[in-house]
Structures are given as structure tokens and as C-alpha cells.
Amino acid sequence: VAYSVQEVPIEFVNRAWPDVEKFITTSVEYADGEFTLDEVKARLVQGSWALVVAVDESNTVRGVATVAYYNRTDHRVAFVTNFGGKFVSNPDVFSQFASILVSKGATCMEGAVRDSMLRLWARLGARKKSTNIQIIL
């Protein structure tokens, strides 16, 4: 199955929400309380995060990613905040996704992932960069 990957313009996030919500819901379950579904939607409609979808030939959403961009001294980072569905299914989908990130100025992509996602991403060239910790104060 061939997928087309495209960024959803901010003015269409609300219209796209019913088609992407189920994918994001699954991803939020693994976020360990970092954000809720409502917070994801708020960040998308406010433009803090970008929404990227993979659609099939009939324009049905098959995968979703949300991305937050930020700048470091040596990179413009595209930090993937959510993945859901068939988004990382093959090199072609990733290539299309990477092209979108580059078009937004990104020089690298990062994300916080479970071990199973790391194994999946490793097939596309990802490497483990660090391990995050958290202490509630």
C-alpha cells in the first residue's frame, strides 16, 4: 500500500481531528502523563505543534505524527511528540516525513520513545541518544 505523507495546515486541524484522534489517543496512553488528548489538540490548533498524516490512495488517514520544532545552537530540532498508526511503516513513508521536516528548517529529528519504537526506528537509521529521567519536586 502506498501512502502519501502531508502536513495538515493549522486552519484544518479541527476538521482533521475526527480522523486523527484515535491514533493520537493510542500514543497518549504511552506518554506517562506528559500530556492529555485535550492538551495535544490545544497545542495543534494553537500552532505549538504540527500535525502530519499518512493517507492511503482513498485519502483515509492511516498514520499520524505530531511535531514540536525548537532551535539549539547547532540544530533546528523536529521533536516528534506522538506517533500513531502506520506512520513508520517503511522507508518511503519516512522519506516523505523527513522531507516535510526539512522543509520546516529541521536539521535533525528527535523523540522520546519506548524500546519497541526504538527498534522500529533503528531500521531507518535512528540511534539511542540518551535516557531521560524525571523526579517530581
Indicate residue ranges for each PLM-predicted region.
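Short amphipathic alpha-helix that is part of the acyltransferase structural core
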Residues: 1-35
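Active-site rim helix/loop that mediates acceptor-substrate recognition in acyltransferases
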Residues: 29-49
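Long, low-complexity, intrinsically disordered polar/charged segments
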Residues: 31-35, 61-62, 72-81, 98, ...
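Structural motif
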Residues: 44, 57, 99-101
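Conserved donor-binding loop and adjoining core beta-sheet/short helix segment
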Residues: 46-88
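Short glycine-aromatic motifs
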Residues: 49, 123-128
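Acyl-donor binding region in acyl/amide transferases
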Residues: 75-124
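Conserved catalytic-core motifs of GNAT/GCN5-like acyltransferases
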Residues: 112, 127-137
